[in-house]
Amino acid sequence: MILIIDNYDSFTYNLAQCVGELGYDVLVCRNDEIDIPTIKQLNPNKIIISPGPGKPSDSGISLDVISSFSDSIPILGVCLGHQSIGYLNGGRIIKVSEIMHGKTSKIYHNNEDLFKTLPNPFIATRYHSLIIDNLNFPSSLAITAWTENNIIMACRHKDNQMLRGIQFHPESLWTFYGQQLLRNFLEYS
């Protein structure tokens, strides 16, 4: 079962639908309607931290989920979930110079892990006003994808490689290869 922590975002159920279309059972729980003991009892195979409004400190249980399970359960943070990973690892979350709401960008990547079967670059849709600052990027994380302007689009923990984040939205219709990226996370983590 794949657990999706919903940070009160309208895209969460699109994300759940994409995961379901790949043949996985999905459970969606709001970030203030579940606790760590319940998640332990559910024993999910993977966890996805959804997009959402606000900043990582507004993401309910999401930060605790990352802290509690990133060494035992593969976790993918999407948008706010990605920023939460950066924040927990000491990164600074800053406003992006151009707000990206429904805009597409070319995403360049390291051809590994989540991206190993994707073209380089590929087109992805972005919906965000915050990013992980690349000038003060945490040494515990590796940048795995970026834009042509060097805005961080994905990261992975260097030691705990089950923890990954992506800034863009794989569930968007305008993100080419988004479902393949999700498949890579679900099948190869």
Swiss-Prot record:
One GO cellular component term noted in the UniProt record for this chain: cytosol
Domain Glutamine amidotransferase type-1: 1-189
Active site residues according to the UniProt entry: C79 (nucleophile), H169, E171
Principal location: plastid
One Pfam entry name: GATase
Keywords, alphabetical: Amino-acid biosynthesis, Aromatic amino acid biosynthesis, Chloroplast, Glutamine amidotransferase, Lyase, Plastid, Tryptophan biosynthesis
Subcellular localization: Plastid, Chloroplast
GO MF term set: anthranilate synthase activity
Record-linked SUPFAM superfamilies: Class I glutamine amidotransferase-like (SSF52317)
Residues holding L-glutamine: G52, P53, G54, Q83, S129, L130
Recorded catalytic activity of this chain's protein: chorismate + L-glutamine = anthranilate + pyruvate + L-glutamate + H(+)
Lineage top rank: taxon: Eukaryota
Metabolic or biological pathway: Amino-acid biosynthesis; L-tryptophan biosynthesis; L-tryptophan from chorismate: step 1/5
Subunit note: Tetramer of two components I and two components II.
Name under which the protein is recorded: Anthranilate synthase component 2
Native source organism of the sequence: Pyropia yezoensis (Susabi-nori)
